Amino acid sequence: GNKGCGTKKSLEEFRNNWQLPLRAAFSDRIYNTDKFLVDGEWASCFGHIDAIHSGEFMGIAPTNKRVKIHYTDFWEVKDGLIIDNWVTVDFPSILSQLDVDVFNGQGWEAYDRGEIAPAKPN
């Protein structure tokens, strides 16, 4: 997955290093699949989890704020078995909801607000 997700090579690693930490950091989780797509041996979905930030997350103490965790999930399936899985999670959005600006005010939203002007292309 994207930076911050890490790489899991087994179901045990997924459970111990993804699922359990997520559950420890976010309670009252409601999972929402917005769209599910299939194309041959590939399947994908995107959606979000509504949850309460009730445990430590990436070094941030619990805030008890309700957050929306956007994700995409891709699976490669052969002979009825998942042989690969790629997940992306919108960590900058989660952190922003917890009042952490990972872009230090320099995200492209600053262009939208007119705070900075884009550089001219070379």
Question: What residues fall within each predicted segment?
Answer:
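C-terminal and inter-domain tail/linker signature
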Residues: 1-122
